[in-house]
Amino acid sequence: MRPSGRKIDQMRKVSFERNFSKHAEGSCLVKFGDTHVLCTASLEEKTPPWLRNSGKGWVTAEYGMLPRATGERMKREAAAGKQGGRTQEIQRLIGRSLRAVVDLQALGERQITLDCDVIQADGGTRTASITGGWIALYDCLKWMESRNMIKVDRVLKDHVAAISCGVFASQPVIDLDYLEDSSAETDANFVMTGAGGIVEIQGTAEGTPFSEEEFTSLMGLAKNGIGELVALQKQAIAG
């Protein structure tokens, strides 16, 4: 039995609140249970130096956690003067995941930055950031389309979403909360497109290596979960 009472293949309640920020071209407050992340997409009419005069645009991401997003207050990374390794790893993952479904040539020489700020953390902040970040990116592109800058269906090739899976109490489970994640025997993150393409898989065993059979079970849970998340994304943007 999972501490939350959920079934092994049951995700937490997921919700998207679009246009949460009045200033950003695109924004979304995403909730995976008690994990809440504000994702904003900001458009700039410039590209990184290595892309100048290439005709291509860029999509990148930054990630951070509010000091009291966790049980005890964390010091702001800005106060330390540098980002931690975990932060850099996560924001690169978010950027890679979103670029996987964007035609950078069709975007033109512009940059969209996704800022993913964790308001409350209870496990799965990176997967929530990717899934909610796609909504914010979509709304930013719709904003651009309304100003005759691009066509959304030419720039955005597919949905992308992410979910965590792991082995907890010797059982493969989906969408681990913090209590499960902190004591899981295996922890994995899956990023996939709406068409089922694999963007990234991160998997780590804690102490005991996991078997190919266990990995196959986790992969099956992830595919079903991401299918549900993509359906929720479609429902959110249709509203």
UniProtKB/Swiss-Prot annotation:
Phosphate binds at R86, G124, T125, R126. It is an enzyme of class 2 (transferase). PROSITE patterns: RIBONUCLEASE_PH. The keyword Cell membrane does not apply. It comes from Rhizobium leguminosarum bv. trifolii (strain WSM2304). NCBIfam families: RNasePH (TIGR01966). Pfam families: RNase_PH, RNase_PH_C. GO terms for molecular function: 3'-5'-RNA exonuclease activity; tRNA binding; tRNA nucleotidyltransferase activity. This is Ribonuclease PH.
